[in-house]
Amino acid sequence: MPNAFLMDNTLIIGKLYQQFSNDILNVDVSSDMLSVTIAHPVIHEVIRFLKENPELDFGFLTTLCGIHYPDRGLPLGVVYHLHNLRENVRVRIKTFVPLTDPSLPTITDLFSAANWMERETYDFYGIIFQGHPDLTRILNVEYLDFFPLRKEYPLEDPTREDKDDRYFGR
């Protein structure tokens, strides 16, 4: 029996533009997955909208992770993957924060699964999730004074000739 309601990327982006037109910075589709870059001040409202809008119903947080692309001129970022289980549709939401103020609101009030994901993102990238119930390091030692997945440090000893950061995505 065919589904009477088939969600597609056009519907999702249309709903987002209706609510957040001034805050959408980029839209891209890769392998049929919609990717939307949002201004960081409204990220919590966008995630809430995607979850609570009855037509969209993105009620499952698949993952949340940090990113850092300094060679592309992009500061620190967070990528959220949301899933509508009823329609089996996924959406990727990205937002970027400046290195001078790497903070975003927590979404643990929307998805309890975000708790450890936000802690891991803080632990490795230093992104502070305001309002998080326990934003402490989760994998690294507490006294570590840097964030190991930021691309601010060379991967290898610069005097070694057998290693080249270009081969490791830098």
Language model features with spans:
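Terminal low-complexity/charged segments
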Residues: M1-R170
